[in-house]
Design a protein with these regions (language model features):
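Active-site nucleophile elbow and catalytic-triad environment of alpha/beta-hydrolase enzymes
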Residues: 203-218
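Active-site loop/oxyanion-hole signature of alpha/beta-hydrolase fold enzymes
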Residues: 87-127, 276
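Conserved alpha/beta-hydrolase "acid-adjacent" motif
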Residues: 235-243, 275
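Conserved HGGG/HGGXW glycine-rich cap/lid loop of the alpha/beta-hydrolase fold
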Residues: 45-95
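Flexible "cap/lid" loop of the alpha/beta hydrolase fold
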Residues: 134-142, 148-184
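Alpha/beta-hydrolase fold catalytic core
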Residues: 2-58, 82, 291
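Catalytic active-site module of serine/aspartate enzymes centered on a nucleophile-bearing elbow/loop
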Residues: 260-291
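Short beta-strand/loop motif that positions the catalytic acidic residue
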Residues: 222, 228-230
Length: 291
């Protein structure tokens, strides 16, 4: 097999992304058509959304480089049987156009808030994966009344929540490394302007390489019940994960005090990408927690 990427410091992070892209094509995708879809003008850009089903609103926030279909295609058919599912594609992702607007978690969370305003959704349960989980944390901190229950899948509220090799993975990467990749094919399939590909990747790599920290004190102030789902080998620093759970009121002894309202689930033998592919497991956790 021809070696496309050279250098040990480059190969591992590229493989991480390649696996992430691969899941897009492994997914059967949702078989449903959205009951509603469109663009919301918010904070100077137009954010794409899709709505499925009826019931209590449930907002889904995808991971970096992902789309609604690629991230949530296996879950939406089941979730939308009992919930009004609102899936959003963030700046530059999927159907949402690229913008040279500064990309940061606070702005992305504000975009989600704007979409909820547009759809007249006062509050909702929110589920975020990876980058989407960080956005969900930010939304909960800045607009706590928006979030009834929060589900965080393989994500963190600070850079040091990742193991060092993950936190530094994107710093040496360049847009040209993604040429002719499955990610490029997925982008070309739905992006409003395919010529923005290189700018999008460059923007995302800069965003992912930027350190962030929403503050332990802000996490401790979250009053919404939180479910954290992590793969045991998903790249999250498990010491920091335990601290996060303690900040949310967990990690004690429920034999001696009431069970905390926030929960932690560590799925065995799963990576960052792999845990998201465990649709049945995730649906089971969501069903129990979101009731």
């Amino acid at each position: 097999m021809k070696r496309v990427f050279k250098g040990p410091h480059v190969l591992k992070p590229v493989l991480i992304i390649a696996m992430l892209c691969f899941t897009v094509f492994q997914s059967n995708g949702q078989q449903l058509k959205p009951a509603d879809s469109g663009y919301v003008p918010v904070n100077g850009i137009k954010v794409y959304y899709e709505v499925y089903g009826e019931g209590t609103p449930l907002v889904l926030l995808h991971g970096a480089f992902m789309t609604i279909e690629g991230n949530w295609g296996q879950l939406i058919p089941e979730l939308s049987k009992t919930r009004k599912v609102i899936a959003i594609e963030m700046q530059g992702h999927g159907h949402t156009p690229y913008s040279d607007r500064k990309l940061d978690l606070a702005t992305l969370a504000s975009d989600v808030d704007g979409v909820m305003n547009y759809l007249k959704v006062d509050s909702a349960d929110v589920v975020g994966y990876s980058m989407g989980g960080s956005v969900a944390y930010q939304l909960t901190i800045k607009s706590p009344k928006r979030v009834k229950k929060l589900v965080i899948i393989s994500s963190t509220y600070k850079s040091t929540g990742w193991a060092p090799q993950i936190a530094n993975a994107f710093k040496n990467m360049k847009p040209e490394m993604f040429a002719n990749s499955p990610m490029k094919t997925a982008y070309d399939a739905v992006a409003p302007d395919k010529t923005k590909w290189t700018k999008f990747i460059d923007q995302m790599l800069g965003f992912l390489a930027t350190s962030f920290d929403m503050g332990d004190s802000n996490i401790a102030k979250i009053t919404s019940p939180v479910l954290i789902i992590s793969g045991d080998n998903d790249g999250l620093d498990k010491v920091e994960l335990a601290k996060t759970y303690q900040l949310l009121g967990g990690g004690g002894s429920a034999d001696m005090q009431p069970m905390p309202k926030s929960h932690l689930a560590v799925v065995p033998s799963q990576s960052h990408v792999g845990v998201m592919m465990q649709s049945g497991t995730i649906l089971g956790y969501l069903d129990g927690f979101l009731k």
